[in-house]
Amino acid sequence: MLYSTCNFLQKVTLNCFSNYEVSGRENVPPVGPLIVVSNHLSNIDPSIVAVSVSRRLKFLAKSSLFAGPFISGLLRWYGAYPLHRDRIDVASFKWALNQLREDGVILIFPEGTRSRGSMIRAKSGVARLVQMSDATILPVGITGTEHIGNVLRVVNPTGDIKVNIGSPFSLPKMDGPIDSPILKSMTDLIMERVSVLLPETYRGVYSLKKDHNK
């Protein structure tokens, strides 16, 4: 109930205060475990992706946002789970894996933090999660939210906000232990699929990549 209500209100504010556009909604798989992977520009990106994708999303959020029982309860009710970025967070990884094993949808921002407009090098946890879950990957590119810094701007999003949803894809299943170079290569492949959904100026370290969505 809270998730649907929040998303409805977010759509209202987007339509009232911004030039909001979504392309590629038809690419969202209707069923099955799904990892939605996006670039990250603003604290309001999770809600922007949530209203743009037709399935119920759950996501990891930095643990510092879970301040106090009220905010913590609200975030969890909306679908968030705390991620401790200062260490290897086994609990959050297991939580995400359990959601996928129940055919759920997890939203991940592999860069690990907001970029300053162009993509930065992603962390390899997303590739490990894909390997352990066999989930389909859905790349998403967001532009226009980088000027919205404060999370309270969720009620007043302005500017040209574009969400581009790419074609879903899968990675080959690897048998046995996977070393760091292979995980990095898989992560780069995933992020390249995100980067081609963005204008060149947003692609950062993943610029000049082939457009897999054409």
Q: Model regions: which residues?
A:
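Short gly/ser/thr-rich secondary-structure transition/capping motifs
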Residues: 15-23, 87, 145-147
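A short, acidic/glycine-rich surface segment
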Residues: 44-45, 67-68, 91-92, 146-152, ...
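Alpha-helix C-terminal capping segments
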Residues: 51-54, 102, 131-136
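Residue-level preference for the first positions of well-ordered beta-strands
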Residues: 33-35, 103-109, 138
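Catalytic core of membrane glycerolipid acyltransferases/transacylases, capturing the structured
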Residues: 2, 6-8, 15-16, 28-87, ...
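Catalytic-site beta-strand/loop segments enriched in glycine and acidic/polar residues
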Residues: 99-126
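A cross-family acyltransferase "interaction/gating" segment
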Residues: 119-181, 211-213
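Membrane-interfacial terminal anchoring regions of lipid-handling membrane enzymes
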Residues: 1-8, 12-15, 21-30, 98-101, ...
